[in-house]
């Protein structure tokens, strides 16, 4: 457990450095939210209706933007080989790296959501509801994205390949995240059903993601 804690702290420190990826994701999220009101126009009701979808889409794209460095940097400097040969199971190491990625890249987006939601004409209860759905759903984006990041490393491809692999897996999270947000804000549909499915997607990805990523890395590093 001490080794996993050290790995999490190391990845968070690297991500928070200039050029480490976390700041890039937050700035991209901020850019998406700030530019959308100019694209939508002066219709504040339309902007508020689109607000949850804009916030969720920004979070998805920001997460995708930073996923390519999840394993690639360690692969380039040889750290990934040491992690694979360590006594700690590779599945737990993958889970620790995904957790560090979420803490450095996903959690800041959730914290910023209540403030940025005001730019989309959402009131405080509405932005709080969106932040709650992001808290439940963004782990699924990270842990499913980890599978694509591992495949991109083993196939020595990044960028477009990662997007092609991850986006289909992220669509259900996006659908139920937006549905839960809209149900909490406007109704009349129940908030509980889509939110429960969103939590279930995160739990399933939490279990399946590390094992799938570890299998991919083992085959790629052999």
Label every model-predicted segment.
Residues 128, 133-167, 218-222:
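A structural motif at transmembrane helix-loop-helix junctions in multipass membrane proteins
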